[in-house]
Amino acid sequence: MKLFRGPTASFVAAAATLAVVSGVNFNSDVSVKTTSAATKTSSTKQTAVQSAKQTSSDSAVSLAPVEPVAACSDLLAVDLTAIGGSGSNITAAEETDSDGITYCSVTGNFASTAGWQVMMPVANWTQRYMQVGCGGLCGNINIQPGAADGSAEVSNGEFALASTDMAGGSDGEFGLDEDRRVAFAYLAVHQTAETAKKLIKAYYGQEAAYSYFNGCSDGGREAVMEAIRYPNDFDGIIAGAPAMLFTFQNSFHHGWLSVSNTDDEGKRVVIADRASLLHDAVVKACDSLDGVEDGLLSDPRLCNFDPSTIECAADATDNSTCLTSAEVTAMTKFYNGPKDSGKYLTVGEEQYGSELAWSGVFVSDSYTGDIMSTNTALAAIKYLIFEEYPGDNYTLSDFDFAKSTIELLRERHPLLDAVSSDLSKFHKAGGKLILWHGWADPHISPRTTIAYHEALQKNMGKSALNEFERLYLLPGVYHCGNGEGPSAIDLVTPMLEWVESGTAPDAVETSTPASTGDSKFGQWAKSGSGAGGPPSGAALQRNLETEASASTSGSAATTVTRPVYPYPAVAKYKGAGDVNDAANFEKGGALYTKTTRSWLGEDFFKPYTPTKA
């Protein structure tokens, strides 16, 4: 019953219903997409798609809705032992409503204790599956598709959805357990994909026509990890602000930001309102470098602002409009990153124009406030990225920002990192990859994503890469959303068009978000280290992406729209008209043409064989 669509769907459903009444064997193995299964060639898909029932959807292909052939509660009988190991179980299978959409929500756990949730629409399933990534060190399940602002398929509840907590937790202690560490590194995501596909087959009587992955932050790492390790799991992968260089990201990067903003007394050197002072100076100095004064830096690499230019005079008694010497030193470290013998230890640190985003990450509102970067770094350093456990009393003052430490990261690099520049198997399978990153992201440097894009080009060739990969950079946008720049974006629709009809994406319009809620897409869990799926009867965890409106370009009443183009192209102002209107921009050439700077860990981006544990 593969790929039945259009007019045939109702007949298939009827036949499958009879099979259920007669007693379907839910414990039989389902053929998840493997290398051999990948021979579902594009021509086969196109033939099937041609018979699809057309609807009012704006996506490239409109697939006929398929109704369930089994009761939701029947899915409790599905055996997942072959997928998740002995002890894997389904804890609940029941219908529940969210935003007027009724889902069959199925939850459970794998042997590693990783929890998962699959949600299948009772009506209007248009034969697509989307798995959503999990942010931070995970430990919770929140199925919230991001980069989907304007996607009819997402907002109408047409996707079967799933996610996993990856057996993780924000304190990182799960890393001491090998099974949970492996589940977090890669395995739980793959097992969830296999589980969802098996449940979809059992519930609807047919497989999903297309499968997609959509994640940001660690979810972005998970996305690229799937392309590397399991190239046939998904037809299309959207990876936002990917924490793909995990071992560096959560040690050298966050660790450096923490120690650089901590004085000898353990207090903060720079606080939020002082970062705001710096931001104003940066924008004043560099805003016009991209050809338009709009409060945004289209490519921060053009900016070379020196914080010392607004340093207070030695005899100043009022520093309300200038920076202290200590602040200048700390801010310069934020931008430059750590070095050993004059050589950089990271790809790139904070970008000019990101200053307002520092608050809550490595800058606090007060001189005695905690900063997230400290906890982030310690969780990874103590429990995940090194083979040897450094002990309970380990602090960031014990971390050596040196080349020798990079050598210690190599052991778990092929387990945790997702930066192999060989995606040839994913390419051969017909997969499509969209990378995206906010230029003002304080958590993960967009330069890491650029460096990965460049590594792919170098290893695979520009022509081959152009067949299946695109990178979008969003000016003024923070981590997975929000910011001074327009951050609402729909990359789902272009991905569907690319995968299902072969139309490669080009210009994508962004806008200021209209909603006012907090986004959980790609974000860290607030607390907790426990694993396991939602308990029986747990509330449905489907939420559309929403973003805070505290920081957007223009006034609160102003809607800003702006196109973004595949890197290295940028949106170029036409020279006339409202700078807040996308219609007044066109595709422009690269503003910055240098490749990523040389740094001591650049060989991590070379092709490598991922390890299992």
Task: Give the ranges of each region predicted by the language model.
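A catalytic-pocket lid/entrance helix-loop region that shapes and gates access to the active site
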Residues: 225-227, 232-339, 473, 487, ...
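Glycine-rich nucleophile elbow surrounding the catalytic serine of serine-hydrolase chemistry
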Residues: 215-225
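Fungal secretory targeting signals
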Residues: 1-29, 34-37
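Short beta-strand/loop motif that positions the catalytic acidic residue
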Residues: 435-437
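Alpha/beta-hydrolase fold nucleophile elbow
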Residues: 206-217
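Histidine-bearing beta->alpha loop at or near hydrolase active sites
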Residues: 468-482, 514-518
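Cap/lid segment of the alpha/beta-hydrolase catalytic domain
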Residues: 135-205, 251-252, 259, 393-407, ...
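Catalytic-loop region of hydrolases
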Residues: 23-27, 33-35, 40-128, 132, ...
